[in-house]
């Protein structure tokens, strides 16, 4: 059992390192994209859309943009990793390792969740300069971000294997 955990941890580290090496493309670009969405839609629609009395339209957009970034990047990480490995022919080396299917699954999904949460946190930190959203239940925000990222990472894994 300890060997399986070691292998899963190593594969998780490899996958996190894979997206972190090109962090400008995998982290900074999605953060910039979300900020551009916020600036464009927030600026254009701020005066025309009234959401709630106490909440500005820009503050209303921030949680949706954060969650959109988390979900998109969790899906993109797992699917692109599998597809790139298939194209380059290196997937066979991962499949030949003495890892269980669960260890393999946890490593790929875990790295995708990490990327999704890192991008989501980056979007949230950058958007604080434009709006101050209020949170009624911060614990539920974290739970939904984790579960949503895991779900989309799993769907990305399926899409990558199927493609």
Language-model features: where?
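Hydrophobic transmembrane alpha-helices and immediately adjacent juxtamembrane helices
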Residues: 1-163
């Amino acid at each position: 059992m300890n060997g399986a955990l070691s292998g899963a941890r190593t594969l998780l580290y490899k996958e996190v390192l894979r997206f972190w090496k090109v962090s400008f493309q995998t982290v900074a670009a999605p953060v910039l994209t979300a900020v551009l969405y916020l600036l464009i839609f927030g600026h254009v629609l701020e005066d025309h859309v009234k959401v709630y009395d106490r909440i500005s339209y820009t503050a209303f957009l921030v949680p949706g943009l954060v969650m959109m970034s988390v979900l998109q990047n969790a899906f993109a990480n797992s699917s692109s990793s599998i597809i790139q490995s298939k194209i380059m022919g290196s997937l066979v080396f991962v499949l030949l390792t003495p890892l269980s299917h669960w260890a393999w699954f946890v490593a790929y999904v875990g790295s995708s969740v990490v990327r999704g949460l890192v991008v989501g946190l980056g979007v949230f930190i950058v958007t604080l300069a434009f709006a101050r959203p209020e949170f009624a239940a911060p614990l539920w925000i974290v739970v939904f971000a984790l579960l949503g990222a895991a779900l989309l990472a799993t769907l990305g894994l399926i899409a990558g294997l199927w493609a």
